[in-house]
């Protein structure tokens, strides 16, 4: 399918009083198919979301698969002081060259790769989980929290690219394609999942 700007725009605006606006979670599932768009394929603006992209071929002209950001609508609800659900993305059965950009600092994002090879930047301190059949190559500077059993063999970064990650131990490693992985334990940083 040739889409205009994006494949999915997901956002919320307040229609009145009530806490439901902060607890609602939208579900987005894209199974199979081919999609072309100019902007990020899936855009989440100040909204809690469960996103599954399974076996789809997505070509974004700007090179971004999922982007979260603060809603610029003046009626957008502000979750300040609330522990909101966040944005949970699963990429399954994919080989994709697109980035994941998390710019909504009012909620957290998780990314699970299941039988997926991802080439792209991951920004904003995304909590990243890779199953044994998945691999990530960063093609732009990235910031993540490594979750679960992630082996160095599953990670790569292009020459000149730095991946900053919260993980189990302090280490700096040169990856196979020449990029650098800098890992440090949680210490109250912007990427700390305990925050």
Residue locations for each model-derived region?
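Beta-strand-rich solenoid/repeat architectures in extracellular/passenger domains
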Residues: 1-6, 12-14, 25-38, 54-66, ...
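Ankyrin repeat (ANK) tandem arrays and their immediately adjacent linkers/low-complexity segments
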Residues: 65-71, 102
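Internal alpha-helical scaffold/solenoid segments in large eukaryotic proteins
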Residues: 38-39, 49
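Low-complexity, polar/charged sequence tracts that form flexible coils or short amphipathic helices
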Residues: 21-22, 35, 43-45, 82-83, ...
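All-beta strand scaffolds that present successive hydrophobic residues in beta-strands
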Residues: 9, 24-32, 48-55, 72-79, ...
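Extracellular beta-strand/loop-rich repeat segments of large surface/secreted proteins
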Residues: 101-195
């Amino acid at each position: 399918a040739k889409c205009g700007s994006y494949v999915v725009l997901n956002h919320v605006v307040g229609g009145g009083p009530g806490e439901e606006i902060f607890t609602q979670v939208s579900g987005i599932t894209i199974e199979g198919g081919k999609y072309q768009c100019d902007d990020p394929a899936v855009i989440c603006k100040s909204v809690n979301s469960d996103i599954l992209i399974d076996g789809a071929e997505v070509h974004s002209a700007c090179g971004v698969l999922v982007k979260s950001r603060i809603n610029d609508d003046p009626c957008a609800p502000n979750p300040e002081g609330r522990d909101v659900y966040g944005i949970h993305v699963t990429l399954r059965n994919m080989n994709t060259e697109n980035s994941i950009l998390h710019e909504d600092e009012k909620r957290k994002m998780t990314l699970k790769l299941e039988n997926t090879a991802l080439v792209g930047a991951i920004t904003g301190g995304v909590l990243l989980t890779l199953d044994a059949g998945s691999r990530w190559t960063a093609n732009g500077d990235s910031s993540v929290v490594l979750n679960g059993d992630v082996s160095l063999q599953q990670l790569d970064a292009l020459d000149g690219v730095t991946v900053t990650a919260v993980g189990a131990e302090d280490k700096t490693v040169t990856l196979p394609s020449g990029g650098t992985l800098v890992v440090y334990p949680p210490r109250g940083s912007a990427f700390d999942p305990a925050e």
